[in-house]
Structure formats: structure tokens, C-alpha cells
């Protein structure tokens, strides 16, 4: 399993629209990607900061998505973001929700 962490600051006037756009425009693109497992969208109570965590079967799946589809998603996100979103990659070590993926490692 592999994870991507995208964080961004929302424009104040766009904060309420972003989760709706995420569900209608971004999530369908993610679901079509080979190796996509799950997405977690986190928004601060003030609705100014967003963290999106996507889980992938492999690092290669995440990298293919980043090369081939993320530029399209970035255009959508840029309508809502102040500044440039930050993208980080992680190797998940434990999850109570995705336990079977980690059991295979042991």
C-alpha cells in the first residue's frame, strides 16, 4: 500500500464549494485509476485548510496517477487554492480500517 498526502489553503470565498466539487469532479477521476483504494478528505473547522489522503495498491499506481491524471485534478484544485498545493508520499505502516493490507506484510 502507498499513500499520497495533498494539503492546501482554501480561498475564503470558495471554502463551502470545495467538498462538493471534490465529490463531483475529483473523486470520479480517482475511482477510475488503476490501483486506487480509498480517499480521505479532511477540512479544518474554519474551512481554510484541506488535507486529502489517497491510498493506492502500490507506489507505481500512485506515480502513474501523479503523472497522467493529477495535472487535470490540479487544475480543478487551483480554482479553490491559495498558493500551490503540497504533495507528499508515504508508506503506510498501520491502519485499523485497512488491516488486511498490512497483515500481508507480516
Positions of the model-derived regions?
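Glycine-rich beta-strand-turn "strand-cap" elements at beta-sheet edges
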Residues: 1-2, 8-11, 40-47, 75-106
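Short, well-ordered beta-strand segments in beta-rich or mixed alpha/beta enzyme
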Residues: 3-8, 38-66
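Short, surface-exposed ligand-recognition loops at beta-strand->loop->(often short) alpha-helix junctions
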Residues: 9-22
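Intrinsically disordered, low-complexity acidic/polar segments
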Residues: 15-17, 63, 96
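An amphipathic, aromatic/His-enriched active-site/gating alpha helix that lines ligand/cofactor pockets
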Residues: 24-25, 30-37, 55-89
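Residues in and immediately flanking transmembrane alpha helices
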Residues: 51, 70-71, 104
Amino acid at each position: 500500500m502507498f499513500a499520497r498526502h495533498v494539503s492546501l489553503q482554501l480561498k475564503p470565498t470558495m471554502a463551502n464549494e470545495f467538498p462538493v466539487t471534490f465529490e463531483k469532479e475529483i473523486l470520479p477521476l480517482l475511482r477510475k485509476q488503476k490501483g486506487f483504494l480509498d480517499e480521505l478528505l479532511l477540512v479544518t473547522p474554519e474551512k481554510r485548510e484541506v488535507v486529502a489522503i489517497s491510498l493506492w495498491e502500490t507506489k507505481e499506481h500512485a506515480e502513474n496517477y501523479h503523472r497522467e491524471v493529477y495535472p487535470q485534478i490540479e487544475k480543478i484544485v487551483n480554482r479553490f487554492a491559495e498558493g500551490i498545493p503540497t504533495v507528499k508520499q508515504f508508506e503506510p505502516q498501520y491502519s485499523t480500517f485497512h488491516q488486511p493490507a498490512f497483515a500481508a506484510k507480516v
